[in-house]
Curated annotation (Swiss-Prot):
This is Cytochrome c oxidase subunit 1. Component of the cytochrome c oxidase, the last enzyme in the mitochondrial electron transport chain which drives oxidative phosphorylation. The respiratory chain contains 3 multisubunit complexes succinate dehydrogenase (complex II, CII), ubiquinol-cytochrome c oxidoreductase (cytochrome b-c1 complex, complex III, CIII) and cytochrome c oxidase (complex IV, CIV), that cooperate to transfer electrons derived from NADH and succinate to molecular oxygen, creating an electrochemical gradient over the inner membrane that drives transmembrane transport and the ATP synthase. PROSITE patterns: COX1 (PS50855), COX1_CUB (PS00077). GO terms for biological process: electron transport coupled proton transport; mitochondrial electron transport, cytochrome c to oxygen. It comes from Kluyveromyces lactis (strain ATCC 8585 / CBS 2359 / DSM 70799 / NBRC 1267 / NRRL Y-1140 / WM37). It is found in: Mitochondrion inner membrane. The gene is COX1. It catalyses: 4 Fe(II)-[cytochrome c] + O2 + 8 H(+)(in) = 4 Fe(III)-[cytochrome c] + 2 H2O + 4 H(+)(out). It is a multi-pass membrane protein. Its cofactor is heme; Cu cation. There is a cross-link at H241-Y245 (1'-histidyl-3'-tyrosine (His-Tyr)). O2 binds at Y245. Mg(2+) binds at H368, D369. GO terms for cellular component: mitochondrial inner membrane; respiratory chain complex IV.
Amino acid sequence: MIERWLYSTNAKDIAVLYFIFAIFCGMAGTAMSLIIRLELAAPGNQVLSGNHQLFNVLVVGHAVLIIFFLVMPALIGGFGNYMLPLLIGASDMSFARLNNISFWCLPPALVCLVTSTLVESGAGTGWTVYPPLSSIQAHSGPSVDLAIFALHLTSISSLLGAINFIVTTLNMRTNGMTMHRLPLFVWSIFITAFLLLLSLPVLSAGVTMLLLDRNFNTSFFEVAGGGDPVLYQHLFWFFGHPEVYILIIPGFGIISHIVSTYSKKPVFGEVSMVYAMASIGLLGFLVWSHHMYIVGLDADTRAYFTSATMIIAIPTGIKIFSWLATIYGGSIRLAVPMLYAIAFLFLFTIGGLTGVALANASLDVAFHDTYYVVGHFHYVLSMGAIFSLFAGYYYWSPQILGLYYNEKLAQIQFWLIFVGANVIFLPMHFLGVNGMPRRIPDYPDAFAGWNYVASIGSIIAVFSLFLFIYILYDQLVNGLENKVNNKSVIYNKGPDFVESNQIFATNKIKSSSIEFLLTSPPAVHTFNTPAVQS
């Protein structure tokens, strides 16, 4: 047991560890968001007894837990580690032991984060950790230092993982698997790994300077010593903007597979999809200052960042329309993964549209730090990254676990979270247009109506998550066994396959990617002899 799970060098076992960790942290992060919404359900003090510092600590905890401890471990560490070697026909990840330490950096990081909330009065800085609020004058205890250590540990984890994914993809593809034949999910993880590799060192530099400012009397961000807090913002957002693409691009890969499978068609414009993802990744590094329109940038700088930000809409639009073209004329089956994929397309597009409004420097002066921004990025993250997470789970878990989930319960869970998430985040745009500021635990009575609606929505969404945990339990305990490989023919809940640009065939089934040709669940060691493309 200890040998298998603690010292594991098996990508599949490490992926399972990532999933368990991510589910645990996701529940904690969701609990924090529920407390935030309960506090904001009505004007005045509701649940936090006027402790406004605690409110901000919850905001930090919610953000960091969900970004660094749920979405990245699940999409990249979980699906990436499990599916990428299967999809390229590799026996494991290139650096198997490095993979192990990538995971085991995360539990200590979680310990640091939790500890930071328990000492003094916690780190109430917002997830951006801007000085001077995060400096030693405003946050005197070790809270912020512990939060910085947590970020360092997650950065190490992600960096090592990124190196591992890049080397594995370049060196361990099976015979006949050229780069142009890689499945889209592999491409998405590959591109994400490059984004991590280039952006995380900048974050680490920024928070290390903050650590030195706080403890060793340097003045990187200390105006009295000739420093500038705006430097920190540049460093943070040079990481922070690629980070949001790191969160969503693996989701793009998952959605591509699902849309293709349940439309019984190859993805429309597969190579264009790869170039679109790569363009999004590259452009993501050229737009960071659109988070900083109000710090006093020159007019020409603002003009550039406005234009560059809008250009990202082009490759994103290519992806959306290619997915629609894949669905169009297909033989669509609305299984749960497909429901999530279609919801993803609709809601991600809405999130993108509100983003176009925020891209304008002049408009953003009004929108900055209001709930309009919160509504925008939760549409693209909550209904982009999290929906693709659920979609990937419902798509691949019967193959990974060898057990089916209850389709009817899963559909109910989808509709609950679909309704809940929209009821939470749509009203936030209305609040933001009317000027309700972010990160504030109380508000004038005029904002009460929509805040109450949003809080009702969060209760619906939390119910859907409880239902998901039950579905998971039911699948593991009572799930129907996935005995044979031609299940997609005899059992209507499995995916339908179709001839794609590349065909992997056994005598039972043809598939557009390798993973469904293996036994279910896959053997502990797959591809000891290389898979050869037919």
